[in-house]
Amino acid sequence: MTFATKVKSEISHNKGLIARNKKAFSYGMLLCGKSFSAQNISMTTENKYIAKLYAKLIFQQIPMQTSVTTREYNGNFQQTTYAVSVDDEEDRKTILAFFGHDAQGDKVCNAELLEDSEHCYAFLAGAFLSCSNISDPQKDYHLEFVLAGEQTAQLMMRLLNELQLNFKLSVRRGQQ
């Protein structure tokens, strides 16, 4: 088991953190997943438990008409990958509204959900499960958030700055 897998397991099984800050934690998972819009709400992960947690947190908080689909497939290097998606457009709009977004995508990040440092840490923990990797500190300490949109990256930079965590922004080739 890799160091990143151990960290993700520790976070995803921290029931106290999740229960106290469920909305902020969920917001981090959903906003920083693969997609968060009226057209598509989804995430992919190699961790089955994280995929189940993503779907569970949606159902626990938001009244849904249809379903959230979790698919298992062989990804890169024959690694099992789980894709979770919200199937119905009305359900996606309901989820967006729950987190203070509109269906047109005018509001990309809702900073109101991150009112204090505990909510910010919960958001970062959720985001970590959806889009991050961390290297073993015994070798080379490096934490990476891979975010889809510039506004989400701006929110992440603001949060890290407010929490006095050092970071640097880099744009991967071909991702401009």
Language-model-detected regions and their locations in the chain:
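DNA-contacting interfaces and partner/effector-binding or oligomerization modules
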Residues: T45, K52, L57-N76, T81-Q176
